[in-house]
């Protein structure tokens, strides 16, 4: 609304957007959370980053920058961490697929539903921790976790496979790194 009257979108990308949930400035640009993914506003123009580029979901309710080069997004299916430089590259058309990481109940959250009933649903505290409103409380990522920057799953070691002997006879497996 400009001057208390609706604004008719001039760009086709805006015509599909029904809901705007939040905005933040990150990397020197305005990012807008919508029901159609993220919109980046630069010099009066909008570009879209959505599931077509690798976001796990399109309806994004809020976002918060972590101070370590990532933007964290909230939605009905969890929290997503994505590198800000990747978002910029995807919005510019220089990157076809984001390396977005989704966190949810399997990662220890009581609920992956992070739409919140009021704003803000995501917040960065002065100590660097990130707080997210969920349907069953608050999920918090501490600054130590964020600074590690390694969110990969731990290595898996298979020590025994009792089924193999029953099905295939006496087969021994040797797994090495």
Walk through the language-model features, giving the residues of each.
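Surface-exposed extracellular loop regions of Gram-negative outer-membrane beta-barrel proteins
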Residues: 41-42
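Surface-exposed loop/turn elements that mediate protein-protein interactions on large endomembrane-trafficking
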Residues: 1-2
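Residue-level "micro-hotspots" composed of small/polar
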Residues: 12-21, 36, 47-177
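Repeat-blade elements of multi-bladed beta-propeller folds
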Residues: 25-27
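Short acidic alpha-helical/loop segments enriched in Asp/Glu that coordinate divalent cations
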Residues: 9
């Amino acid at each position: 609304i400009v001057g208390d009257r609706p604004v008719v979108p001039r760009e086709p990308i805006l015509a599909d957007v029904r809901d705007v949930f939040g905005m933040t400035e990150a990397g020197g640009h305005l990012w807008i959370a919508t029901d159609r993914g993220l919109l980046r506003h630069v010099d009066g123009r909008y570009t879209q980053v959505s599931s077509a580029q690798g976001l796990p979901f399109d309806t994004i309710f809020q976002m918060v920058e972590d101070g370590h080069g990532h933007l964290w997004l909230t939605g009905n299916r969890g929290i997503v961490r994505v590198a800000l430089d990747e978002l910029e590259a995807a919005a510019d058309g220089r990157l076809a697929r984001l390396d977005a990481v989704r966190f949810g109940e399997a990662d220890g959250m009581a609920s992956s539903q992070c739409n919140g009933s009021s704003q803000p649903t995501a917040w960065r505290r002065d100590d660097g921790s990130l707080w997210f409103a969920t349907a069953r409380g608050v999920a918090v990522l501490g600054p130590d976790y964020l600074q590690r920057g390694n969110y990969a799953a731990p290595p898996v070691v298979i020590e025994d496979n009792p089924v193999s002997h029953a099905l295939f006879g006496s087969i021994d497996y040797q797994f090495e790194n």
